[in-house]
Amino acid sequence: MRAKRVGAALVAACLALAGCSGGGTAPQPSTSARPATTTQQDSAQPSVAREEALSALLARRAAAVRSRDRTAFAATLASTTSGFGLRQLAQLDALDQLPIGRFEYGTPEAAPALGPDRIAQLGPDAWVARVEGRYSLTGCDTATRGFESYFTVVRRDGRWLLADDTDGGTQTQAWDLPDFTVVEGDGALVLGSGPASRLRPYLTLGEHAVGQVRDVWSGSTWNGRLVLVVPRTPAQMAELVGQQADSVRQVAAVTDGPFDPSGRAGADRVVVNPTAFAGLQRRGQQVVVTHEATHVAIRATTTRPVPLWLSEGMADYVGYRDVDATEQQVAAALFAQVRAGRGPTALPRAEEFDPAHTTIGPTYNAAWLAVRQVAERYGTSTLVRFYRAAASAPSADASASEVDAATAHAFQDVLHTTVAAFTRQWLSAIRAAAAG
């Protein structure tokens, strides 16, 4: 199955380029429940009139966002001077900086009821609605992204208005970042906490990454646009990707985005961990951004999953392709394991990329060397054909065995070899490099 969140660019994978040491971890899909609402009882279903009134209000709010109409937007708020009201106006200011294409809200549904204390604060008619919104960025997205909001709704002078968004599990979005700023180039758009001078270096990295990816992943329908999100703290990064802060501590960046029913991504974001990223030298930072840009391009132009060793190895191959670094530097962690008698015996399995069960730096090294072996032996264009052939499982949610079968056919049809023969050659090369 294709994962919504992929391609964690690890600090460990770039340590030789960073002048630092440590182990990397990749974020895993969250298993925790959404934040609980302040409820002590189940909610009654909203009346039809109440729901219709809120739908109309949200339609006006969405139209105000699209037209950058501050007055109309403010008219949907119970107060423009409360903490919520001020946050909402700041959110509108942030949205005004974005090239918004679509922006809309779906049909609201009742969330769990407010507790007695909140009812006493807000009034007996107050209720909480869960709303799924969707948006896209013009020139960047070929599909929409969803975002979930929990709005607390109150009646004032016969009208329903928005009073808060903290009585449920409202998802943090890029436009919620403090000091929100946008910088844009031909191939990249960078969103984050400003000033612009802080974000421009990321824009330069993104622009170069797009060119690097195009040099390899040629002939595709990718639009060549990369959206980078640069928060100010690791905690903000974790919130944006729905993770616990500890799970992203050693992650330099991660690609996050939805798939359409066919299995194609069209609204990916590369979310940066600013602290981990700052620990890398410039060339290490470029590897990280190019790694993620590779994921973005491939996710936008293929619809079927491939083994993780191939997807992560491909991203690292493109990332390191133009970097002045030896394999001894890049794969130092793997070679150390081999010399200690703990080297791989097969191509990396999916669970070996899980930091909860293993040290994954050597796994990424092994995947990189496997993909590089294909490129060096058969050529980069054949590597791309091999990847596309491997990405031909029966469906976007294909089983692991179906993915492996498609990959085995790609070995035979494109490389004219078998998985077993390729693996023997790869293992032999790793052992020779570790010994040398």
Question: Where in the sequence are the language-model features?
Answer:
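N-terminal export and membrane-targeting signals
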Residues: 1-13, 50, 285
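Juxtacatalytic substrate-recognition/specificity segment
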Residues: 184-307, 403-407
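Short, low-complexity N-terminal intrinsically disordered segments enriched in polar/charged residues
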Residues: 22-67
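Acidic/His/Gly-enriched intrinsically disordered linker/tail segments
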Residues: 256-263, 267, 283-284, 302-436
